[in-house]
C-alpha cells in the first residue's frame, strides 16, 4: 500500500478485508455491504480506486471430513458446534495464538472439541485423510479443498471478514487512461472460490507452471489471445 501511494506503481491486486483492517484501521468485521464505504475512503484518503473485483473470497474457514459431514448432516459452523465434542480439531500453531483464532472462534460458535491439536500447516490435509483429526482450518481458495474427501463449512454467523480480491488503481491513471475502466471491468466476477481453488490445485498438487495455468484460464475467458 505505501508503495502505490508513493507512486512506485499504478495498480496492484489486494484483498478488501486486509485493506479494511490494516490500511483503514477499522475494528468491525468487514462484510461485502461495506464495499462502497471502503472504496469511498480509499478515494478520499489516498486517491485510489477499487476496480475489477475478481469475484472470489479468500478467507478463513473450517473443513470437515466428508464422511462425517454426511453422517451428522453438518453444513455450517453452527451445525458443527452441536457435535464438536465428538471431533478432534487440528490447526497450525499460530491459529491458537491469534486474536481472531481458536479462542475467539470457539467463543463465538460455542465450539467445544474433544481435542484440539496444533500441527504443521503442510500436514493438516493428510492428517484429516488419515483420520488423525476430523476438522481443520482452511483458506477458501486452498487447492486441496477441491478433494471430494473434504467439505468446507459455511461460516453462517459471519465470524470471518470477507477477503474479496480486486485491483487497487491510482485515480490519476484512470483519469488519464479512461479506457482502463473497460479493461478492468472485464475482471469483474471472473472467478469464484471453486474456480480459484481448482486453479490453485493445478499448481499446488499437479505442479503445473503458474504462468501457464493463468494464461490458459485467461484465454478460455477471452481475455488473452494466443
For the regions a language model picked out, list residue spans one by one.
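Alpha-to-beta junction loops
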Residues: 5-14, 84-87, 104, 123, ...
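Pocket-flanking alpha-helical
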Residues: 1-28, 36-39, 123-124, 140-149
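A conserved helix-loop-strand patch within extracytoplasmic ligand-binding domains
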Residues: 35-89, 189-193
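Ligand-binding "clamshell"
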Residues: 23-51, 130-132, 144-158
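A bilobed periplasmic-binding-protein/Venus flytrap-type ligand-binding module shared by bacterial periplasmic
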Residues: 59-70, 164-177
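Short helix-initiation/N-cap motifs at beta->coil->alpha
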Residues: 1-2, 93, 114-126
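A local structural motif
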Residues: 85-88, 106-119
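An extracytoplasmic/periplasmic, membrane-proximal ligand-sensing/linker region
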Residues: 100, 106-111, 179-226
Amino acid at each position: 500500500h505505501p508503495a502505490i501511494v508513493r507512486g512506485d506503481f499504478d495498480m496492484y491486486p489486494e484483498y478488501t478485508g486486509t485493506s479494511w483492517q490494516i490500511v483503514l484501521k477499522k475494528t468491525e468485521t468487514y462484510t461485502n455491504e461495506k464495499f462502497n464505504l471502503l472504496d469511498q475512503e480509499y478515494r478520499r484518503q489516498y486517491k485510489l480506486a477499487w476496480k475489477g473485483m475478481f469475484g472470489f473470497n479468500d478467507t478463513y474457514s473450517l473443513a470437515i471430513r466428508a464422511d462425517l459431514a454426511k453422517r451428522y448432516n453438518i453444513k455450517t459452523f453452527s451445525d458443527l458446534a452441536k457435535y464438536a465434542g465428538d471431533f478432534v480439531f487440528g490447526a497450525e500453531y499460530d491459529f491458537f495464538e491469534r486474536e481472531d483464532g481458536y479462542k475467539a472462534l470457539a467463543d463465538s460458535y460455542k465450539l467445544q472439541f474433544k481435542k484440539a491439536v496444533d500441527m504443521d500447516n503442510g500436514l493438516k490435509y493428510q492428517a484429516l485423510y488419515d483420520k488423525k483429526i476430523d476438522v481443520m482450518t482452511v483458506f477458501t481458495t486452498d487447492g486441496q479443498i477441491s478433494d471430494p474427501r473434504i467439505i468446507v463449512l459455511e461460516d453462517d454467523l459471519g465470524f470471518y471478514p470477507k477477503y474479496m480480491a480486486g485491483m487497487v488503481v491510482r485515480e490519476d491513471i484512470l483519469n488519464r487512461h479512461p479506457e482502463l475502466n473497460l479493461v478492468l471491468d472485464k475482471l469483474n466476477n471472473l472467478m469464484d472460490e471453486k474456480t480459484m481453488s481448482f486453479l490453485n490445485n493445478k499448481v499446488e498438487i499437479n505442479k503445473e507452471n503458474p504462468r501457464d495455468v493463468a494464461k490458459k484460464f485467461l484465454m478460455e475467458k477471452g481475455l488473452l489471445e494466443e
